[in-house]
């Protein structure tokens, strides 16, 4: 995508972006520092891509980062500066015909407005590759130029001999200039399923080499998208291109009359197997000015309608560390909400504390998010780091485990509440209306500090808790009665006994707690590790105390646990 296209699109969008997005609560000094850091990040990406042929981020993440830069500049009254991403791409060789940009259309309504009053409109896939000029002399391909800044590019003619998949000799000895896209050849590539996988960067990297080589060269194809000096009619241009050995230009181009047809073909190519990756569709009009008047900006006769983002750039607002029932610490990134495939995403899990430590993500960082299986938010990478690194209260993983936090003591509230949620959930006692919010209120009110305290709560105590009405108190008492009368098998599961499902139903707590590790290992499906876990569970002091209390409350299966607890 050209600098001029990006600049036009970004300047068009910056007002609406700023209105839709909240500005960071930064001092003037911090704003200046953070904006400078983002500019430096973008400049580094530009240099790697255009000069070294290395794409450090996906194109859509790059665009979103530039949007974010303009938003920050407006937030803090800074002058709009968008240094050309092609600053290091300009080459020494002038193009015979300038490469234009394309106007970017963001939705079906914008497509309809663009098509209003236009005749002879065609649609074709927007091939995701590297733009080039091809110069034929007497029918032979003699020059291959990188797009550069649209006016001047680098000479890639040294690679012509290795590009076996490209027509290097026309049927007639003609002098012709073509413009097109060098792409990575793929087999039955479905964009909606596979995405682009950085194929553009792969091709750019190969072409940046001093020598390409036959094997890499054979993996590169060409999609010709313009013949600047060709006939006025697009259909005639495509027919002649096919006769010269460029059939894909005709095969993947369709004349349309309505925005609905544009929508149809965009969706069709998005979900159909193609020989190349794409990132949208191109709309072009038959009528255009003479080639000598073309400029490297977005003209009126070409527009792009890109596909939905496969990755979204999201700002981290908060890093939370969730502690589950078993003591596992899971970092959770709270995000400034973004939309992917019509899904609003405001948080994503990092999976493990070790992963967070390796990534060191802090509030203010920009991260890439995608959807796993088209539904589950997935963290992909850190895209940009904030200059200011906030200090976070990070839990020590060693403090938590299977036998920690059986009570609501300091530093234990979260794991303890998770134990209560599990106990009362469908996998345990199946007590209606006792979710995390209810238990949190009771714990914070000091009414529930152990796993058995709820068994003795009365209506008056429940009504003293903020947020619990008389109706809710009555419902909770009914739910507590249900839990109290559940059979032992459900209590066993709710307390988290690490026993397999095939433990005999008629066994009680005293029988289970009386087994040694070697006794457990004689049962089907229990190995040495599980046997040790079971023995440790039943001999844990806190677990024994809970069992004793349940026995005194008359809970099924816990009679006689006083003796077990004193062993």
UniProtKB/Swiss-Prot annotation:
It is an enzyme of class 6 (ligase). The gene is ligB. GO terms for biological process: DNA repair; DNA replication. Pfam families: DNA_ligase_aden, DNA_ligase_OB, HHH_5. It catalyses: NAD(+) + (deoxyribonucleotide)n-3'-hydroxyl + 5'-phospho-(deoxyribonucleotide)m = (deoxyribonucleotide)n+m + AMP + beta-nicotinamide D-nucleotide. One of its GO terms (molecular function) is DNA ligase (NAD+) activity. Gene3D superfamilies: 5' to 3' exonuclease, C-terminal subdomain, DNA ligase/mRNA capping enzyme, Helix hairpin bin, Nucleic acid-binding proteins. Its EC number is 6.5.1.2. HAMAP family: DNA_ligase_B (MF_01587). Belongs to the NAD-dependent DNA ligase family. LigB subfamily. Keywords: DNA damage, DNA repair, DNA replication, Ligase, NAD. The active site is at residue 126. Catalyzes the formation of phosphodiester linkages between 5'-phosphoryl and 3'-hydroxyl groups in double-stranded DNA using NAD as a coenzyme and as the energy source for the reaction. This is DNA ligase B. The keyword DNA damage applies. PROSITE patterns: DNA_LIGASE_N2.
